[in-house]
């Protein structure tokens, strides 16, 4: 693909307040996933992946269990996905994914993040075409060919595989996520996968102009503070 995948996830927040926000976002996402697809992780593969991801991010078991109990009880909030696109400070392409029970409130909250930092919120699709919706797996290794061969034998559709500085990154269509994950776990049972997610990968990265760097970080921080924002994707070269 001619580019390296940049994992820019913030490390686990150290302050109690920030941790609570992370737990809240996972709790909401697990609740929605379980409510829509069932609370049994063995039957709901998306839920199984989400729980695994939450545990990797050190989300306490009681947060996960509470979300599952809430989903099993029926009723509760009716969260809907919402996506907003636009250009952040410095012209950086941005996709903001939310879960909301009040679309008007969420739109206004996200819009204020754009407005207060001189950014521009756009119409649906305005920047999505600049990203590839991919399944991404990343782990330590030095022989990418053996992994590619194993995935080909498992009839997995692989978009690209890269080796850089002792780290192997596998890209596949987002629809192939569970197929690739199963093949890796089956063929390489001792493999420790550091990143396994469905994400929007920028087709090209853009440097943030020096004069916009502080404002861009403020923009990201404001979005992170929005209760309904679940994930932010951008093409900034950090």
From Swiss-Prot:
Gene Ontology CC: one annotated term: cytosol
Claim: Transcription is one of the keywords in the record: yes
Top-level taxon in the UniProt lineage: Bacteria
SUPFAM superfamilies: YebC-like (SSF75625)
One GO-annotated biological process of the protein: regulation of DNA-templated transcription
Protein's cellular compartments: Cytoplasm
Keywords assigned by UniProt, alphabetized: Cytoplasm, DNA-binding, Transcription, Transcription regulation
Pfam families in the cross-refs: TACO1_YebC_N, Transcrip_reg
InterPro entries on file: Integrase-like_N, TACO1_YebC-like_2nd/3rd_dom, TACO1_YebC_N, Transcrip_reg_TACO1-like, Transcrip_reg_TACO1-like_dom3, YebC-like
Keyword check for Ion transport: no
GO molecular function (one): DNA binding
Membership in a protein family: Belongs to the TACO1 family.
HAMAP family: Transcrip_reg_TACO1
Cross-referenced PANTHER family: TRANSLATIONAL ACTIVATOR OF CYTOCHROME C OXIDASE 1
The protein, known as: Probable transcriptional regulatory protein VVA0010
């Amino acid at each position: 693909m001619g580019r390296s995948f940049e994992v820019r996830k913030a490390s686990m927040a150290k302050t109690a307040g920030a941790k609570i926000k992370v737990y809240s976002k996972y709790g909401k996402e697990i609740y929605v996933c379980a409510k829509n697809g069932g609370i049994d992780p063995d039957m709901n593969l998306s839920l199984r992946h989400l729980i695994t991801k939450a545990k990797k991010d050190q989300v306490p078991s009681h947060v996960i269990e509470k979300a599952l109990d809430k989903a099993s009880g029926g009723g509760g909030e009716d969260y809907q996905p919402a996506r907003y696109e636009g250009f952040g400070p410095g012209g950086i392409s941005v996709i903001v994914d939310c879960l909301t029970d009040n679309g008007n409130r969420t739109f206004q909250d996200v819009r204020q993040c754009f407005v207060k930092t001189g950014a521009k919120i756009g119409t649906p699709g305005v920047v999505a075409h600049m990203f590839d919706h991919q399944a991404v797996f990343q782990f330590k290794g030095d022989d990418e060919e053996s992994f590619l061969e194993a995935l080909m034998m498992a009839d997995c559709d692989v978009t690209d595989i890269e080796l850089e500085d002792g780290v192997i990154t596998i890209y596949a269509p987002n629809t192939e996520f569970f197929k690739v994950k199963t093949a890796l776990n089956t063929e390489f049972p001792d493999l420790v996968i550091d990143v396994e997610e469905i994400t929007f990968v920028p087709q090209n990265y853009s440097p943030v102009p020096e004069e916009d760097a502080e404002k861009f970080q403020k923009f990201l921080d404001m979005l992170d503070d929005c209760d309904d924002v679940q994930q932010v994707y951008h093409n900034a070269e950090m």
